[in-house]
């Protein structure tokens, strides 16, 4: 089963220009869905992504990427 990343294109703490290439680097075959994830509260303050339907957030993008890598290794 392919991995899935879901990210918001409207949240203030998420920069799609830098986040999407980094997610694709982790798994080039993953399905990526861009749009509102109804995660607005945390999305104002933290970088986040849904990985295989599970929300992951971190104070910055670097920490988020580390969490994504760790999640996919399980």
From Swiss-Prot:
UniProt xrefs under Pfam families: DUF1450
Alphabetical list of InterPro entries matching this protein: DUF1450, UPF0741
HAMAP family documented for this protein: UPF0741
UniProt similarity note: Belongs to the UPF0741 family.
Protein name as it appears in the record: UPF0741 protein BLi03984/BL03913
Organism encoding this protein: Bacillus licheniformis (strain ATCC 14580 / DSM 13 / JCM 2505 / CCUG 7422 / NBRC 12200 / NCIMB 9375 / NCTC 10341 / NRRL NRS-1264 / Gibson 46)
């Amino acid at each position: 089963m392919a991995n899935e990343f879901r990210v918001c294109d409207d949240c203030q703490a998420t920069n799609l220009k830098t986040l999407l290439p980094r997610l694709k680097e982790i798994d080039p075959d993953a399905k990526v869905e861009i749009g509102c994830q109804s995660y607005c509260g945390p999305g104002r303050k933290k970088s986040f992504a849904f990985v295989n339907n599970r929300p992951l957030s971190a104070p910055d993008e670097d920490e988020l990427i580390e969490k994504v890598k760790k999640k996919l290794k399980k």
